Amino acid sequence: MSNQVSLVDDIISEYQGIEMQMADPEVAGDQSQFRKLSKRYAELRPIVAVNEELVQARQDLADAKEMAYEDHEFQSEVDRLEPLVVQLEEQLADLLAPRDEHDSEDIIMEIKAGAGGEEAALFAGDLARMYERFADKAGFQWEVLGLNESDLGGVKDMSISFKSKTPSRDGAWSVFKFEGGVHRVQRVPVTESQGRIQTSAAGVLVYPEPEEIDSVNIDDKDIRVDVYRSSGKGGQGVNTTDSAVRITHLPTGLVVTCQKERSQIQNKARALQVLQARLDQMEREAREAEAGEQRASQVRTMDRSERIRTYNWPENRITDHRIGYKANNLDSVLDGDMQDLIEALQAQERAERLEAEG
């Protein structure tokens, strides 16, 4: 308990310090600095708010007990406040529990069709729409950065950014990070004339997005830049002039495309930012793997057997193999109703972190 009190005191002190800095006109005029402070302020605010409620509830409970000693009519107030104090204590403990340091960050997601040809590309498109619909419902902003479509309008590969509309402790990373891996689909493809169920797959990569384009630190000699015409349709919200950019990182072989912006210069800057995010993620995974804390990388191969989740169309069932989650509401999940699934994954992550802390 004493450790928790000390931690809360430190957080309150930091929170008040940030509040003072944000009130400084000079800081307010520096957009980059103000954005960073706002982000940290949003991370701390729920802890400070719940702690204030808890302090008040404890004081009210102490007063009610004292009055109940003199007048039993106040016992009902004691009975009301005791569970409230317990609830707030649990809520505060949950807020103080170890968290992923990137949870408040925006993300970039890449979706790639895997084994299964045209059917895999159509499924990759289904995944993209699922994430976009979920983002709309959950209050995240999203934009398509690059899109390579198949002949039937599926997705060969696609990159999307997801951002919080306002700084939040629970940013896009806190929910979308669980989507990295191989997703498997079982259904009758539109290209199948015999009505046979087939299995195909799509891969999803998720990584935090750098806050500033200025943070890109990639040597020009390590990249090859190609310019091409976008393949996206007008309705996809991507540019269709000859300004699309493809950047290949020669040391790693990573390839990033961007066609969202209206000029080659803007698309190159955005693609470099995405590439930096991927390189940062690779470096993070290498460090964590060395420390023995990292699970298997998100997508080692596009093999259908290496899957994190299966989408079974005939049975309307979704299965997450990491936590044994099963639900017969695939149709609603594909419509963006992913909250139950994500909360189950978050609960498992919290349990694992608490266990690791001992």
UniProtKB/Swiss-Prot annotation:
<dbReference type="InterPro" id="IPR000352">
    <property type="entry name" value="Pep_chain_release_fac_I"/>
</dbReference>
<keyword id="KW-0648">Protein biosynthesis</keyword>
<dbReference type="GO" id="GO:0005737">
    <property type="term" value="C:cytoplasm"/>
</dbReference>
<keyword id="KW-0488">Methylation</keyword>
<comment type="function">
    <text>Peptide chain release factor 1 directs the termination of translation in response to the peptide chain termination codons UAG and UAA.</text>
</comment>
<comment type="similarity">
    <text>Belongs to the prokaryotic/mitochondrial release factor family.</text>
</comment>
<dbReference type="InterPro" id="IPR045853">
    <property type="entry name" value="Pep_chain_release_fac_I_sf"/>
</dbReference>
<dbReference type="InterPro" id="IPR004373">
    <property type="entry name" value="RF-1"/>
</dbReference>
<protein>
    <recommendedName>
        <fullName>Peptide chain release factor 1</fullName>
    </recommendedName>
</protein>
<dbReference type="InterPro" id="IPR005139">
    <property type="entry name" value="PCRF"/>
</dbReference>
<dbReference type="Pfam" id="PF00472">
    <property type="entry name" value="RF-1"/>
</dbReference>
<dbReference type="Pfam" id="PF03462">
    <property type="entry name" value="PCRF"/>
</dbReference>
<feature type="modified residue" description="N5-methylglutamine">
    <location>
        <position position="236"/>
    </location>
</feature>
<keyword id="KW-0963">Cytoplasm</keyword>
<dbReference type="InterPro" id="IPR050057">
    <property type="entry name" value="Prokaryotic/Mito_RF"/>
</dbReference>
<dbReference type="GO" id="GO:0016149">
    <property type="term" value="F:translation release factor activity, codon specific"/>
</dbReference>
